[in-house]
Amino acid sequence: MTRSLKKVPFVAHHLWKKIESLNIKKEKRVIITWSRASTIVPGMIGHTIAVYNGREHLPIYVTDRMVGHKLGEFVLTRTFRGHARKDKKSRR
């Protein structure tokens, strides 16, 4: 179910304060955050945000096509190692 149009998109307060201060200073710097649930808004375009995946912070460069999505959608938390092989050696 999508979020109601009456409500504003969720952006963590501490993250929004950092982005606003960088926009005022016209500065580009990597912003480190743990807030995977924050929605990408137009004020974030052009910034690099390092999002935590459970082990490390992975940098994401925000483009205009990402607006409306969550930060966590672009950083995977699980690594896929491949399916089990189908031969007799691997079953032993």
Swiss-Prot record:
Keyword rRNA-binding: yes
GO biological process, any: ribosomal small subunit assembly
NCBIfam families for this protein: rpsS_bact
Listed PROSITE patterns: RIBOSOMAL_S19
One GO MF term: rRNA binding
Role this protein plays: Protein S19 forms a complex with S13 that binds strongly to the 16S ribosomal RNA.
Residue intervals passing through the bilayer: none
Subcellular location: Plastid, Chloroplast
Species classification: Eukaryota, Viridiplantae, Streptophyta, Embryophyta, Tracheophyta
Cellular component, GO annotation: chloroplast; mitochondrial small ribosomal subunit
Family: Belongs to the universal ribosomal protein uS19 family.
Pfam families: Ribosomal_S19
Name of the protein: Small ribosomal subunit protein uS19c
Keyword field: Chloroplast, Plastid, Ribonucleoprotein, Ribosomal protein, RNA-binding, rRNA-binding
